[in-house]
């Protein structure tokens, strides 16, 4: 088991691989199924993980995008994602990581405040996507969006890079810091 690196494998021709990471197995499975239903020009591979680091496997494909799914109804979900982030190489945060937050629609049941997750995404300079994955139509729309992001991150969309896309997905209330 080791740190997950973005460039440790060569890219595959017409193949895009996403890694969905969360403690919520049922939500991950439903999201993965919705993504696989989407029409994609390249071969789409979806890997699910409920923990990091991943086992060192020679046959594991190159991962083009990592999506950390955080359930606002579970502090455990946020704590585990924070732990998992330690096992991801910093090169992934150059446009190949995003956070997907679910459960924001029912604020009265949230045990994690939205601002906590916003700060986490801002700290890692990664986009934050909000979606209630319990609702089929929302899940399908998010799956289409993630497939499109994945195609860009895999380099299958001419003229757009992952880093360029992620800078466009940044929220306007969190402008880039002046320290850079």
Swiss-Prot record:
Has UniProt tagged this entry with the keyword Cytoplasm? Answer: yes
What are the annotated GO cellular component locations?
Answer: cytoplasm; inner kinetochore; nucleus
**Can you cite a GO biological process for this protein?**
chromosome segregation
Q: Which UniProt keywords apply?
A: Centromere, Chromosome, Cytoplasm, Kinetochore, Nucleus
Q: Where in the cell is it found?
A: Nucleus; Cytoplasm; Chromosome, Centromere, Kinetochore
Q: Which domain of life is it from?
A: Eukaryota
For whether the record's keyword set contains Ubl conjugation, the answer is no
Q: What is its main location?
A: nucleus
* Oligomeric form and interacting partners: Component of the CENPA-NAC complex, at least composed of CENPA, CENPC, CENPH, CENPM, CENPN, CENPT and CENPU. The CENPA-NAC complex interacts with the CENPA-CAD complex, composed of CENPI, CENPK, CENPL, CENPO, CENPP, CENPQ, CENPR and CENPS.
Record PANTHER family? CENTROMERE PROTEIN M
Function per UniProt: Component of the CENPA-NAC (nucleosome-associated) complex, a complex that plays a central role in assembly of kinetochore proteins, mitotic progression and chromosome segregation. The CENPA-NAC complex recruits the CENPA-CAD (nucleosome distal) complex and may be involved in incorporation of newly synthesized CENPA into centromeres.
Protein name stated in the entry: Centromere protein M
Gene name, Swiss-Prot/TrEMBL: Cenpm
């Amino acid at each position: 088991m080791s740190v997950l690196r973005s460039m440790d494998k060569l890219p595959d021709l017409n193949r895009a691989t996403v890694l969905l990471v969360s403690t919520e197995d049922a939500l991950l499975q439903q999201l993965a199924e919705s993504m696989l239903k989407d029409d994609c020009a390249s071969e789409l591979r979806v890997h699910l993980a409920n923990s990091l680091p991943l086992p060192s496997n020679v046959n594991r494909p190159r991962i083009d995008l990592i999506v950390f799914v955080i359930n606002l109804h579970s502090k455990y979900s946020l704590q585990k994602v924070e732990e998992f982030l330690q096992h991801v190489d910093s090169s992934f945060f150059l446009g190949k990581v995003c956070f997907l937050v679910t459960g924001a629609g029912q604020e009265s049941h949230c045990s994690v405040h939205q601002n906590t997750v916003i700060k986490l995404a801002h700290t890692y300079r990664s986009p934050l996507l909000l979606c209630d994955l319990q609702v089929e139509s929302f899940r399908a729309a998010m799956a289409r969006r993630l497939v499109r992001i994945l195609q860009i991150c895999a380099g299958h969309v001419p003229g757009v890079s992952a880093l360029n896309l992620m800078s466009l997905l940044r929220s306007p209330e969190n402008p880039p810091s002046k320290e850079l």
